[in-house]
């Protein structure tokens, strides 16, 4: 069915409630994977997700289209929690159980859902639970990963609660082969701990909820297979708190977070330790009426540590108008670093069973981060915000065949890029003008006793202008953007259990800005096989999965090989 705003809470941008986002198909193996995997691992089954990862469990740079990772935003119950220090959020530290089947808002529609995004958004939320229960999930892999996830829920004194503890640890050692290079990857171990706690209830006609999200992680990186193998160490600790009150037409959300990060660099004769902090406070008020939704928010971002010290305030006003059943518009204004930024978005829908068509246009901004403005040395307080202008078309069909087609066309101006400055230091500059085109096709169909799900994304980019003497990159494509990604899933019900076969394809990617062939990552494809079995009462479930059954060569960064054939066992107990 068409899913228009399937969420248990009000989003920051209610226009998303009118956007058709499509629905992810989850196999039996996928359902258990959400209790064990991180969001970055789980989202690889969606071709709209662009992943850059050194090794399993490493820091992830990701996006949902667009021209850079900073342009795609991550929301938590409508609050933009993407770091305003770095501009991104490491999805390897996000539990997959915070993803719903409609979490991804693709294209320029995602820009309407966040404070400063322009292409794609991911909305995280903890699904509500009824009754009382406890689940324990355990995951084991052949490369040394061990995962434990404990989830309990219930109520006391008319207060609902959910508690989640997730622990992951891995030696992350495996053999590799890239071309004629062979060896064993070592020194990339990692571990993380996540604690989520929710309380919710009602006081008269007022609904309230409070959420605490704590994460602590440590990751090692031994560098590429061409490096000497010095091990760098990253420590990260973050606590997030969100409180919500909702009564009638009014809603208030308060969000606060504090992150501490330490990076130890040993890839030279010197051992360097860099420690930094980042904080965010957001107060968000929403007034909901039949023809409009009004939003007022106040954001405070702070950064401290060895490389930058800064505090920036960002008040924002947003008005969502619904003049008719077919039309929706969003108007936004924000003040950031003594500048006022405007953006606008419009959506038109036409529905005639079994078809749904939507057209949308929008103009957005991507604000410079605190690192880009204040990093020492190299920060540029004068760097301008990126601007984007885009259009989107969506077509959906619901019947025996479920089909979703989307096409996004965007022009980006003043894209920010770190480049050598006049003093020799690397500094952020408004470097590019870029055109991007992203086309997505998703198809689902049940044939006999098999369920088939196919999704593919085609991306095209072209650098139109560059603010430097480096004119040889004009006309070139952006780096690390595969022209084509595709995922095909078949699920077969067996007399006992369920079998899943899933194939992946990632096209050629450029890693050099001049698109020289010496830096190209060739197209890669691999296949996963999974068998799942559960009791009739669903009291237990287990999945045995073989990833990359053919041992295909894979790498998301050049000379950082991913594992070959890997075995995984996931077990879930429910009481």
PLM segments and residue spans:
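Conserved C-terminal beta-signal and adjacent last beta-strands/turns
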Residues: 153, 159, 164, 189, ...
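Outer-membrane beta-barrel signature, preferentially recognizing the C-terminal barrel domain
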Residues: 227-229, 233-242, 274, 351-413, ...
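Gram-negative outer-membrane beta-barrel transporters
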Residues: 321-328, 409-411, 430-512
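Periplasmic-side early beta-strands and strand-to-turn transitions of outer-membrane beta-barrels
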Residues: 131, 155-234
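Extracytoplasmic beta-strand/coil segments of soluble accessory domains associated
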Residues: 41-80
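Short strand-turn segments of transmembrane beta-barrel domains in outer membranes
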Residues: 101-106, 111, 121, 127-154, ...
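N-terminal periplasmic accessory domains that precede
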Residues: 35-43, 60-63, 89-95, 115-137, ...
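Short acidic/polar hinge/loop motifs at secondary-structure boundaries
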Residues: 79-107, 124
């Amino acid at each position: 069915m068409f899913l228009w705003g399937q969420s248990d809470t009000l989003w920051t941008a209610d226009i998303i409630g009118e956007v058709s986002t499509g629905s992810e198909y989850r196999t039996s193996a996928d359902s258990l994977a959400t209790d064990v995997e991180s969001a970055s691992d789980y989202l690889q089954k969606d071709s709209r997700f662009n992943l850059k990862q050194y090794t399993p469990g490493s820091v992830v740079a990701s996006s949902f289209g667009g021209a850079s990772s900073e342009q795609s935003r991550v929301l938590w119950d409508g609050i933009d929690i993407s770091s305003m220090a770095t501009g991104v959020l490491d999805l390897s530290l996000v539990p997959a159980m915070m993803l719903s089947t409609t979490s991804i808002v693709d294209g320029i529609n995602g820009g309407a859902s966040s404070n400063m995004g322009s292409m794609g958004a991911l909305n995280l939320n903890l699904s509500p639970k009824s009754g009382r229960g406890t689940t324990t999930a355990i995951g084991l892999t052949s490369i040394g990963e061990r995962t434990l996830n404990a989830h309990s829920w219930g109520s006391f004194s008319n207060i609902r609660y959910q508690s989640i503890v997730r622990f992951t640890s891995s030696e992350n050692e495996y053999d590799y082969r890239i071309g004629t290079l062979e060896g064993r990857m070592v020194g990339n171990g990692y571990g993380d701990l996540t604690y989520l706690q929710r309380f919710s209830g009602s006081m008269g006609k007022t609904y309230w909820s409070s959420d605490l999200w704590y994460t602590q992680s440590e990751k090692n990186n031994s560098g590429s297979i061409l490096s000497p193998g010095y091990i760098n160490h990253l420590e990260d600790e973050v606590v997030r708190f969100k409180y919500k009150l909702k009564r009638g037409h009014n809603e208030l959300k308060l969000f606060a977070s504090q992150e501490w990060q330490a990076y130890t660099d040993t890839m030279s004769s010197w051992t360097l330790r860099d420690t930094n902090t980042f904080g965010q406070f957001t107060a968000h008020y929403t007034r909901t009426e039949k023809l409009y939704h009004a939003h007022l928010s106040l954001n405070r971002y702070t950064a401290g540590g060895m490389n930058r010290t800064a505090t920036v305030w960002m008040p924002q006003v947003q008005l969502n108008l619904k003049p008719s059943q077919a039309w929706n518009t969003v108007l936004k204004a924000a003040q950031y670093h003594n500048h006022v930024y405007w953006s606008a978005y419009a959506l038109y829908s036409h529905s005639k069973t079994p078809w749904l068509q939507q057209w949308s246009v929008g103009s957005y901004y991507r604000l410079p981060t605190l690192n880009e403005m204040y990093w020492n040395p190299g920060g540029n307080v004068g760097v301008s915000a990126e601007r984007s202008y885009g259009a989107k078309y969506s077509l959906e069909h619901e019947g025996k065949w479920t089909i979703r087609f989307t096409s996004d066309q965007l022009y980006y101006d003043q894209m920010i890029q770190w480049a050598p400055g006049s003093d020799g230091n690397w500094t952020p500059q408004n470097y590019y003008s870029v055109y991007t085109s992203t086309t997505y096709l998703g198809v689902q169909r049940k044939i006999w006793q098999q369920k088939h799900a196919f999704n593919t994304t085609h991306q095209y980019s072209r650098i139109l202008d560059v603010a430097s003497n480096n004119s040889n990159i004009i006309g070139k494509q952006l780096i690390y953007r595969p022209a084509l990604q595709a995922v095909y899933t078949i699920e077969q019900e067996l007399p006992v259990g369920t079998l899943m076969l899933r194939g992946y394809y990632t096209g050629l990617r450029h890693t050099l800005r001049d698109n020289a062939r010496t830096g190209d990552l060739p197209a890669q494809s691999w296949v996963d096989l999974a068998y799942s079995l559960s009791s009739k009462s669903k009291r237990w479930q287990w999945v045995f999965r073989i990833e990359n059954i053919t041992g295909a060569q894979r790498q998301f960064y050049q000379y950082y090989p991913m594992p070959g054939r890997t075995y995984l066992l996931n077990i879930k107990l429910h009481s």
